[in-house]
C-alpha cells in the first residue's frame, strides 16, 4: 500500500496518495510541465527482486498523465503509440524550452526510445538501436538540453548524445579502454538550466 505517487500541498507536512496500481508497482520517474504544475507524467514500474530472482515488468508498468494535479490519471497504451504487451522500466525527459516535447526510454519486448510532440498523449518510436542504452532495468535515465529540444543524452554504461531528437546517437563518454578514470556506470546527469554546455556526471 505504500507504493505509488504521493502529493503534498503544505510543503511536505502531509502527503496524499494520488496514484496507485498494485503492491508490486512503484514510480520509476515523474516529470512536471514547467509551465503548468498540474500537468504531470508518471512512469510506473512493476518489478520484483529477491536474492535469487529478479523480474522487471508486468501489468502494472505504464505511462500515466494528469492535467488536474493528480486528481485523475489517464493511462497511455498502444492506442497512443506505445509498445504492446507488458512494459518494464520507463525513463522520462521533457524539453523545458518546449514542454510539449517529451522522450520516453521504454523497456519492452523490444526496448526503444519514444517521443511525444503533444505533451504526452500520442507517441512515436524514434529509435530501437543499441545507442539508446543497455540493461534498461538498471539504467533508464535520459536528459534533454534545456535550450535544445533535439539534443538528448542517455546515460548508462556509456554516455551517448543525439543531436536530431533521438534518431541517432553518438558516444560522448567512452566506458572501457578509456584514460579518463571514469567508472563505467552513469546513474545521474545534470545540465545547467541556462547553459547546456555545463554538465555534471
Regions found by a protein language model. Name each.
Residues 1-201:
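Beta-propeller blade termini and top-face loops
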